[in-house]
A protein has these predicted regions:
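All-alpha prenyltransferase/terpene-synthase fold signal
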Residues: 1-249
Length: 249
């Protein structure tokens, strides 16, 4: 498994190099990097028997898209909460998101990955549509909210799996990333910060205790499905255990 450790570490460093723009570093927060998404992408593409240079290229470019989306969302979330945040800082954060997105298009176009660009563009479209529904509390059922959570968190990875014919990874990605997002929302809610998922659920269920029960129930169900999946897919379980350990170091 040493090659997995080395490959993962090398890819993470390549991604960091792309993100280290000297001007942005001085004025805005460092972009959030979802280590688990890197690990899932690396593990899935590793199982597709791609060469390490190909894996590195795809993981870095796809994570640039994810970070661009997360950076733009960070501006939207903070705009109403931090009235004293400088206008310049917000503008630079938006520009940073655009910069990361532009890097993604550039890197994929250099390799003429037109089909993958189209697939990821569809994923971006779906993510943005579900973000709008979540923030506008446009859902009619609890299942609709959960669907939006899963799409927002996993669409880029799901489209990548479709492109490389890795359908056996898709359920696992859904369980892990859905659970992670709900855990993050619970932490935000506990700290009395803005939680889009809690607010969306509250739009349907008014009782605060019931809202917490529902979201905790979703997390337990996803964790159960994740564990059951790993029991039945030892190949993914082995890769996952190595990458999980690495992503925590």
């Amino acid at each position: 498994m040493c090659d997995i450790y080395g490959g993962y570490a090398g890819i993470r460093e390549k991604l960091m190099e792309k993100l280290r723009h000297p001007y942005f570093i001085n004025y805005i927060e460092e972009p959030f990097i979802d280590e688990e998404k890197i690990a899932l992408l690396y593990g899935a593409l590793k199982s597709a028997n791609l060469h390490i240079e190909q894996i590195e290229h795809y993981v870095v470019t796809i994570m640039l898209v994810q970070i661009a989306l997360d950076t733009h969302e960070r501006v939207s979330n903070k705009a109403g909460e931090e009235a004293n945040e400088s206008h310049k800082r917000r503008q630079l954060t938006v520009l940073a998101g655009d910069y990361y997105s532009g890097l993604y298009y550039y890197l994929l176009s250099m390799n003429r990955d037109i089909v993958l660009i189209r697939a990821l563009a569809e994923g971006i479209k779906e993510i943005n549509e579900h973000k709008i529904m979540l923030y506008q509390k446009a859902h009619e059922t609890m299942d609709d909210i959960m669907e939006s959570v899963v799409v927002i968190e996993s669409a880029l990875l799901q489209k990548t799996c479709d492109h490389f014919h890795l359908s056996h990874w898709k359920p696992f990605i859904t369980y892990v990333l859905g659970k992670n997002r709900l855990q993050k929302e619970c932490e935000l809610h506990a700290e009395k910060q803005h939680s889009p998922v809690f607010q969306a659920v509250q739009g349907i269920m008014k009782d605060q205790a019931e809202v917490e029960t529902v979201i905790n129930g979703w997390m337990m169900e996803l964790r159960k499905k994740e564990n059951q999946f790993l029991e039945n897919h030892t190949d993914i379980s082995k890769i996952n255990s190595v990458l999980r350990d690495k992503s925590k170091t």
